[in-house]
Regions:
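Boundary/entry segment of secreted carbohydrate-active catalytic domains
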Residues: 28-77, 345
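Glycoside hydrolase catalytic-domain groove-lining segments
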Residues: 84-101, 221, 227-269
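Substrate-binding cleft of extracellular glycoside hydrolase catalytic domains
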Residues: 80-195, 292-293, 309-314, 323, ...
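Aromatic-lined carbohydrate-recognition surfaces of secreted/lumenal glycan-active proteins
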Residues: 183-209, 255-268, 289-292
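Substrate-binding cleft of secreted/luminal carbohydrate-active enzymes
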Residues: 34, 38-52, 261-349
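Aromatic- and acid-rich polysaccharide-binding/catalytic face
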Residues: 64-74, 212-238, 293-295
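Acidic (Asp/Glu)-rich catalytic clusters
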Residues: 57-64, 80-98, 105, 139-147, ...
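Distinct, well-ordered alpha-helical segments
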Residues: 201-220, 270-277
Length: 350
């Protein structure tokens, strides 16, 4: 009887412990920390890869005000980002998108293979083991001071072969989780982590998705799913709606809001392509942000043949009218699908 009583007591204690473990929380190092909720926007943000100082000029030229500023930032530069976030805040911008690249940038002219070669200190395994902890911690602290939402697009397009962080999906996942743990430890609760792939439309859908899944760090470490949407022309000329199937695959799989993290098109046929993009977006309320990028493209520079990407929407009346419509469409409340509601990445995580 005594043994039976002890067994019952053990079972009761086990049930209590397991029940406690179901309370939403995050394991950060050796302690549990709750993640504050960030609201999912019911409008679609529009970002421009520009310094905040030039956002107003862009808005005046295009006739629509971006709601988000975006930039690329490489680990090797070890720069402060407070000037970027503080200027955005001063100009009334409450969201920023940062494409955060764990490497020392390689000159484009050296080619893809040189660019993709692993760099000591910046390799996924090095980051997972703490090689960049001091920098990551400082960067997280700077972003935590921003009175708005930071969309952090870490180590993007990992499912390609042109960046050094594409090597070893397992170590990529480890590096990502380690980075997120540091941000949570610092208390940067205003940061949303954006896992952003390349659509690789030259691949068949199933192997493309299976390859991308290898890099997935886990639902507890991702808030939004992103994808590049660039029509280079030449051998890579794709209508906007060609990207839709890839985006829907990602949304069905992960049930998270989508962000088009880099959007651009060749000069030839640009108006038709942009109209197609607008039509696609009107059918996809799960897309919560679009980031317009007309920065010099490594992809265009390193392709055997790409059409003209060196044009500026600010100076092109025909295309800027469509871009203006896309921006204004997003300012209207977007209908939330049941999938989007169920996909809320703002729920506390385990």
């Amino acid at each position: 009887m005594r043994r039976l009583s002890l067994n019952l007591l053990t079972l009761s204690l086990t049930a209590l412990i397991l029940g406690a473990l179901t309370v939403p929380a995050i394991a950060v190092h050796n302690r549990l920390v709750r993640t504050p909720s960030l609201p999912i926007p019911t409008t679609r943000a529009f970002a421009v890869y520009l310094d905040p100082w030039h956002i107003d000029d862009w808005a005046a030229n295009v006739g629509a005000q971006p709601t988000m500023a975006a930039k690329f930032e490489a680990f090797s530069r070890k720069r402060t980002v407070e000037h970027f976030t503080s200027e955005a805040e001063r100009r009334g911008i409450r969201s920023v998108l940062i494409s955060w690249e764990p490497w020392k940038p390689v000159k484009t002219r050296l080619g893809i293979f040189k660019q993709s070669y692993p760099q000591p200190g910046y390799r996924n395994i090095d980051i997972a083991r703490g090689s960049q902890d001091t920098y990551i911690r400082r960067f997280a602290g700077q972003l935590a001071t921003f009175h708005g939402t930071v969309y952090l697009r870490y180590a993007h397009e990992m499912n390609g072969f042109w960046y050094p962080w594409s090597w070893d999906a397992r170590d990529y996942r480890r590096a990502w989780r380690h980075m997120v743990h540091i941000f949570r430890d610092v208390g940067a609760s205003n940061v949303r982590f954006v896992w952003s792939v390349n659509p690789n439309l030259y691949e068949r859908a199933k192997p493309w998705l299976e390859n991308a899944k290898r890099y997935w760090p886990g639902a507890a470490y991702v808030d939004d799913v992103g994808s590049t949407v660039i029509n280079f022309g030449g051998p890579k000329i794709y209508a906007a709606d060609r990207f839709a199937a890839r985006l829907r695959d990602l949304h069905r799989l992960y049930r998270l809001p989508l962000i088009l993290t880099e959007v651009n098109t060749q000069y030839g046929g640009r108006v038709r392509w942009l109209r197609g993009l607008r039509s696609m977006l009107q059918k996809m309320p799960e897309v919560k942000a679009v980031a317009w990028s007309q920065l010099p493209s490594r992809g265009a520079a390193q392709m055997n043949r790409a059409d003209d990407m060196h044009w500026d929407v600010q100076k092109d009346p025909a295309s800027r009218a469509v871009v203006r419509d896309i921006v204004e469409d997003g300012l209207r409340t977007t209908p939330e699908t049941s999938q989007s509601r169920n996909a809320a990445p703002v729920q506390p995580r385990r």
